[in-house]
Amino acid sequence: MKHILLSLSLLSSSVLAQDTSLHDYLIDGEPWKEAASGYAFTDGLCCDAAGNLFFTDVKAGKGIYKIDVATGKTDLFLDNLPGISGLQIGPDGRFYACHNKEQRIIAISMMGEVEVLLTGVKCNDLVVSKKGHLYFTETPTLSVHLITKDKKHLVADAGHVQKPNGITISPDERTLAVSEHGGKHVWAWRIEDDGTLTAGAPYMTMWLPVGKETAAGDGATTEVSGRYFVTTELGVQVFDTAGRLAGIIAKPDPLGKVVSVEFAGKDHDILYIAAGEKIFGRRLKVKGYFGQP
């Protein structure tokens, strides 16, 4: 019954589900292009309103890096913040980060001033709503957490998602989606007015590699029409608003790993992925939700 109610909630949003395929997303002659290289383990992709891309190097990085939207040049943007795995710019213009190395959730001003929001958590990835509610995944404890706009901490869900990892939100901010690293589903919940989660269900089913029982779901993001992009062992799996798989965007390196995904660029139509030591991007027919005014 919860799954049915959630389905009706999604279908009654401003975006109606349609049958789609990758032809609705991909542009002929637009392959993956290397955007940055020379890192140990890139992660934490996020963007700002101008379309600049920010990322981290979890294993060996010094802080937050920036790929400039105008020049394509990569520079260290904020120093002395090693070990960040999840990153997003919130409605107040600050970075919000899963500082996994220090087991804490922090907010960081563009000048590098740090506010500690929560400690003692093995956080992985996060998303922040326009209302200011922050949701993050804690993979080892199989839990999804909420820090409300009033800075109250709640465990929003526990024990259901198999190794929760990537996390994103629908454009109407009524649905939260979380990928399973240790399973084959992307879970979805209805977001109530107070930020709490209800009606959780395994809403999307990821394709599995041959002979494996897990899809290794990782990073996740959303485009403006409400479709979900999730990194997996097979590539970037794309789901429509009804939870149907539209297809899989192949990885730049068939043997490589992709962990984080985000739209950026001047028109927010370049899909970027964190792939080990490199960042790749490719222009699509659709635009990302995050960073939009």
What kind of region is each of these model predictions?
Residues 18-31, 291-292:
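Blade/loop signatures of beta-propeller domains
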Residues 31-36, 73-78, 113-118, 152-158, ...:
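A short beta-strand motif characteristic of beta-propeller blades
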Residues 37-50, 80-99, 103-104, 119-136, ...:
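Beta-rich, blade/repeat-based domains predominating
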Residues 55-75:
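Beta-propeller domains
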Residues 58-59, 100, 139, 181, ...:
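Short loop/turn segments immediately following the C-termini of beta-strands
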Residues 63-65, 104-106, 143-145, 185-187, ...:
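A short loop-to-beta-strand structural motif that recurs across blades of beta-propeller domains
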Residues 189-196, 284-290:
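Short loop/turn segments immediately following beta-strands, especially the blade-tip
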Residues 260-293:
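Blade-level signature of beta-propeller repeat domains, shared across WD40, Kelch, NHL, RCC1
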